[in-house]
Amino acid sequence: MTASRWIVPLLIGLAACGAGVDPAGAQQARQMLNGFRAEQGLGPVTASEALEAAAMAHALDMMRGGFFDHRGSDGSDVMARVRRAGYGACAVAENIARGQGGLAEVMGDWVASPGHRANLAMPQVTDYGLVRAQGDIWVLVLGRDGC
């Protein structure tokens, strides 16, 4: 089953159980990401349901497990999580954050951090997924499928 066929039932199920993860302001996120990338002379990124699913899974894992790390509770890294979500990544990066109350704040913090900024400015990425979980846990996954 492709990510596009199971993402809607997943989102409905999460909403029903009060999981507290919602897509983070899709239009605003796209504008902010692509505005930053344009300032760097880079091409735009497009929202990906599969990358959003991978970001959501990690945000829920951290929220439920009470931890904050790029490694999942099962030892997974971002590449393993995006592949589980059906995305055949050849390039991938992940930014996580905690405590920022809004998209502008989290983006500002990522741009100000050299490592996070480098991820935002990866020239080879073409897609992204961004979610925010309860407790203001943010996960951004950037990738390129099928290089």
Regions found by a protein language model. Give the residues of each.
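Extracytoplasmic/cell-surface-exposed regions of Actinobacterial cell-envelope-associated
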Residues: 39, 43, 67, 77, ...
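Disulfide-stabilized extracellular recognition modules
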Residues: 89, 97-147
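Bacterial N-terminal signal peptides that target proteins for export
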Residues: 1-8
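Short, surface-exposed glycine/acidic/tryptophan-bearing loops
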Residues: 52-102, 120
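N-terminal Sec signal peptide cleavage junction
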Residues: 17-19
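A short alpha-helix/helix-coil micro-patch that ends at or immediately precedes a cysteine
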Residues: 22-64
